[in-house]
Amino acid sequence: MLFRSDIDPFYGAPDVVVVLADKSMPTYVYDGSLVMGNIMNAAADLGVASCWVHRAKEEFESEEGKAILKKLGIEGEYEGIGNLILGYAAGPAGDPAPRKANYIYMI
């Protein structure tokens, strides 16, 4: 079992998108991460909330995860980049944290 049965790692979200990337590509982690970010930006533009839920790498390295991929007909050397939950927020977003001073430098 990948998760404890008493925990919902996806916070009750109605939709979960799993991003996998082909490990034969030298930039697969960057490519998959960019896919995640672009989906999150597109969702926000449509008024849909999103959250990147980690552990996809570990999930699909497990025997249970490999069995899921096989059942779906996904063959090859893929690595889980992330799980992306999508839905409508239960309430308004809180205020953003203050920016860190001297965190970004202009050169």
Q: What does each model-found stretch correspond to?
A:
Residues 1-107:
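Acidic, surface-exposed loops and disordered segments
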